[in-house]
Amino acid sequence: MIRLQHVSMVFGAGPSQVAALTDISFHVAKGEFVVLTGPSGAGKTTLLRLLYRAESPSEGDIDVAGFDVSALRRSEIPRLRRSIGIVFQDAKLLAGRTVFENVAFVLRVLGTPRREITPKAFAALKAVGLSARAQAFPHQLSQGEAQRASLARAIVKSPGLLLADEPTGNLDEEMAGEILGLVKDIWSRGTTVVFATHQARLVPHLRRRTLRLEGGRLVKDEG
């Protein structure tokens, strides 16, 4: 599902050059749940951005879901992203749209037949326990509810890969546990998951393979 070979990422040039990632190599099998951990600034977000081609690597090869991401043409990026669901630390919901409309919007962009949009959107909301809040607007949601909506939006297109970038970073322990449980439920249905977190207390609860970044380098791969 994911393969990185000797991937490095450098920002800037000359004396101001900063190495965000250095010589990263690993493989994630289809259906695997991988925890990407490390302190803030270790390179976790940069690595995820490379996977969905928000950034291009300075060196190395990246393959994701059958796409040669490092050589992908700009016109092919939307095809890659159709196979990936993404959840951020900030839910990034559209402020002027209801929870249902936020989720359904993804399907409309993908050209889903109109008759399929409503049942698929409600199925995604049901999966994250948010059906009762379908007509609420983002400003009416708690932080936990907003992340549930973000998760529903990520899974509504039935992606083969879910990238979760610090989705529990702004949540208290109880809410974080709920989101974590939902992500594990999604994984149990066959979705490959890469879950990034700097919260060391979460890692033992996940009990999954762990990749640890420090200073832009992969220093541990275990589990």
Q: Model-derived features: where do they sit?
A:
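The feature captures the beta-strand-to-loop junction immediately N-terminal to the Walker
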Residues: T37-P39
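Helix-to-loop junction immediately C-terminal to a conserved catalytic motif
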Residues: Y52
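Conserved ABC transporter NBD signature motif
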Residues: G60-D68, L80
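Short coil-to-helix segment of the ABC ATPase nucleotide-binding domain corresponding to the Q-loop/switch region
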Residues: R97-F105
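Conserved ABC ATPase signature
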Residues: F137-L141, E145-Q147
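Conserved catalytic motifs of ABC-family nucleotide-binding domains
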Residues: S158
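Catalytic Walker B motif of ABC-type/P-loop ATPase nucleotide-binding domains
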Residues: L162-D165
